[in-house]
């Protein structure tokens, strides 16, 4: 089996992981952890979400985190924006990269953002135009690609329509998210190969380990030529629509897999694991990842 020779991981724990934690993490602690992640060799780190602090108190210090971190020559910092105001905040804070998110499933769109898929698409077009005008690289994340309430309840035709619609708007990357962990290795390959027929924009996969198939799905994606993934330290994260669900596939688990396959990442896994252990101690509980306690 031929795999990519190199894989790029984006660490999303400081955003997608931290936002689910009710125990507020002090700004200086977040900054110290992120700085250690930078030193571990992670090429991309999603460090904040530009949302209302009442809705997500953990992200109330987004600008402060960015200001205290400054720049890191070897690492791209990005933030998640859910509306035009969020894009403006990301640009004003000095980020060079922003992640945007739209629904592919009508029920998920109304549950999560209070808007239809078409409304989300129109808003995304405005956000992309603003972000590119402000000089930021844009990644568009499409949610629940493999299903929302049950596997397959998001039409693949809609995913393909969105991939085509946004193929010539200047995106840096196009991310397919298994937001509720509905994918399996066969469906991963079916969707990835279909999307590749309609867009040349680089693909990123954002996989959750909700049902224990995260690593198997990574292997399936590698077999389909995907070489960029979102991962989260220690497996931090979750899904607001599935109580008790685990989060993103764990960074340490993915790095261990890639190392064992001879695929280069440039990441020092023991350094990431050290941060995860400190996060675990701070939160007072074990994390869902496997390797963070072993390396």
Per-range role (PLM):
Residues 1-295:
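Catalytic cores and adjacent flexible loops of soluble metabolic enzymes
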